[in-house]
């Protein structure tokens, strides 16, 4: 096990011997971290913000979670998931395998993202929302540019398989897309 002495660890953890826990990480009680995960990775911009993983969360193998993020209680992160910096993930959220959360995103409680979902930087997914496989939330209206205009999905919405939502769009309460 490769765990930084600066990480703060709760009780009853199950951390794989092949996982790496970096500085500035707080892991609460009952968290499970799978094989080959990188937890608390920094980048050139975010080098000293805390990553907080709240109690009873499960992070499956090969997932990477950057500093400055917050993962809520009882959440499940699938295999090979990337969660970039400054992402806030609520309680009881499920993020499927091979999904990509591009940073500065909010995913509220009780939301479910199936496998292979791409959430563009700056997107906001409100509570009780379902995104099915291969959904793409874009954020650059005139690529390649420095404009980042994330998608907002309001509560109780469903976005069906292979749907692409364009930058800056707001899907209203209870939307069904696909």
Where are these regions (language model features)?
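Left-handed beta-helix
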Residues: 4-5, 10-11, 16-17, 22-23, ...
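Blade-loop segments of beta-propeller domains
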Residues: 45
């Amino acid at each position: 096990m490769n765990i930084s002495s600066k990480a703060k660890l709760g009780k009853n953890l199950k951390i794989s011997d092949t996982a790496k826990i970096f500085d500035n990480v707080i892991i609460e009680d009952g968290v499970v971290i799978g094989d080959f995960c990188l937890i608390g990775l920094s980048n050139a911009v975010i080098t000293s913000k805390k990553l907080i993983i709240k109690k009873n969360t499960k992070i499956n193998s090969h997932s990477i979670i950057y500093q400055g993020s917050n993962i809520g209680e009882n959440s499940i992160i699938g295999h090979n998931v990337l969660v970039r910096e400054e992402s806030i993930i609520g309680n009881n959220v499920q993020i499927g395998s091979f999904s990509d959360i591009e940073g500065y995103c909010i995913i509220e409680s009780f939301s479910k993202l199936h496998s292979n979902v791409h959430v563009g930087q700056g997107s906001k997914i409100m509570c009780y929302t379902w995104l099915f496989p291969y959904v793409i939330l874009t954020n650059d209206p005139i690529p390649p540019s420095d404009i980042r205009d994330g998608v907002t999905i309001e509560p109780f919405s469903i976005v069906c398989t292979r749907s692409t939502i364009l930058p800056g769009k707001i899907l209203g309460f209870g939307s069904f897309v696909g």
